Amino acid sequence: MSIDSLDMEARGVGRLLNEDGTPGKVIFVEGALPGETVSYRSFRRKPSYEQAHLVEVRQESVMRVKPGCQHFGVCGGCSMQHLDSRAQLAIKQRVLEDNLWHLSKVKPDVVFRPIAGPDWGYRYRARLTVRHVAKKGGVLVGFHERKSSYVADMTRCEILPPHVSAMLVPLRELVGGLSIRDRMPQIELAVGQEVTALVLRILEPLTDADKDLLRAFADQHKVQFWLQPKGPDTVYPFYPADAELAYTLPEFGIRMPFKPTDFTQVNHQINRVLIGRALRLLDAQPQDRLLDLFCGIGNFTLPLATQGKSVMGIEGSEALTTRALANAEYNGLAARTEFACRNLFEVTAEDIAALGRFDRWLVDPPREGALAVCKALGELAQQGSNVLPQRIVYVSCSPATLARDAGLLVHGAGYRLAGAGVVNMFPHTSHVESIAVFERG
């Protein structure tokens, strides 16, 4: 069978022909690439499609490359290592444009050059699963196997920073020596500028011997351990207690302290480039009042504060709102910033109107998108309100919800999609991050 394209999960897509020559059932083949002729084995059959494993590549695509990780194909952390990095970007751009058009009949005036950076060692945040497996004689620490609840037997990971990848085997040995080796379901990783933090989710208290092992490991590998006995709000630094987790935005002279459970961007290098492009697209003037929705700890808010007259950040999490305020004070930007905690998934037109007019907005929602915000703007446009901003820069981590929201802004609130492009925040995965700019009038 010939493979024509890739789907959102990086599976090759081919189509069988019926006996009369008309297009038949769609076949999704894991590991196959566009332009290839393959043989496959189906493992799930439905009336209109089948899912299949790749058996043999009979004609190879020019886009196929050797995966950079020995665990690729088993580990579920990556799905595109067999695809040339330039082709990955092109496919992600096509996914973005297809979603915009097919879901909302919207096309960008300009397609931006993709934002891309290092393909390896980029992942500064990760959630690793811990599993005590008696049959394997120890503990596994890593990502899940592809489409499985099993943990991959990983000895290194090429998308993690090299010092973290080199720590995986010692970390397995450490956990295997703890009394609660079977009562620690996950380890959350957060890498800062100077500190690497490991958050241990513990279901039972550590013994004194366990604590000694953690201290010795932290000293040897230059990491900081945090403990999480219950929910995310119970996280606290264990050892060393005084290390500060932070990342920097040197272009703006900003340092951003954060807790390892706070939301921060996975890819530090791409984050810096993304902020720079977002600010250039927003093109704030010295007299402008700016609004940053879903502001988190102030990742965009504080750089924006160096551009316009003032900026207001709104965030749904009280903890993140508090952190954003503290970061503004830490960086000497408190006088030019204001923060509020609001549920932006339930915001109304009246709520938006009550904020007053802001000249330009930056919107950076989670995967759910900004549905309520965009609906509210549509209602305000119908009312002839003067609070709608001239320009909106929208940073998205889901092309489907961006497309939905773009349709509301373009068809309901009088904006045009001036430009859009992909941001390769997660190389070698099918995750599509993007940035778009909307203009009104």
Swiss-Prot record:
- Xref: Gene3D superfamilies: 2.40.50.1070, Nucleic acid-binding proteins, Vaccinia Virus protein VP39
Task: Give GO MF terms, alphabetically.
Answer: 4 iron, 4 sulfur cluster binding; iron ion binding; RNA binding; rRNA (uridine-C5-)-methyltransferase activity
Q: Where is the active site?
A: C397
Q: Where is the TRAM domain?
A: 1-56
Give the UniProt record's GO annotations in the biological process aspect.
Answer: rRNA base methylation
EC class name: transferase
UniProt keywords, alphabetically: 4Fe-4S, Iron, Iron-sulfur, Metal-binding, Methyltransferase, rRNA processing, S-adenosyl-L-methionine, Transferase
Keyword Ion transport belongs to the record: no
The EC number(s) attached to this protein equal 2.1.1.190
Q: Which reaction does it catalyse?
A: uridine(1939) in 23S rRNA + S-adenosyl-L-methionine = 5-methyluridine(1939) in 23S rRNA + S-adenosyl-L-homocysteine + H(+)
- Sites binding [4Fe-4S] cluster sit at C69, C75, C78, C157
- KW Kinase (keyword) present: no
Annotated S-adenosyl-L-methionine binding lies at Q265, F294, N299, E315, N343, D364
Q: Which HAMAP family match?
A: 23SrRNA_methyltr_RlmD
Identify its protein family: Belongs to the class I-like SAM-binding methyltransferase superfamily. RNA M5U methyltransferase family. RlmD subfamily.
Query: What is the role of the protein in this entry?
Result: Catalyzes the formation of 5-methyl-uridine at position 1939 (m5U1939) in 23S rRNA.
**What name does UniProt use for this protein?**
23S rRNA (uracil(1939)-C(5))-methyltransferase RlmD
Specify the species. Cupriavidus necator (strain ATCC 17699 / DSM 428 / KCTC 22496 / NCIMB 10442 / H16 / Stanier 337) (Ralstonia eutropha)
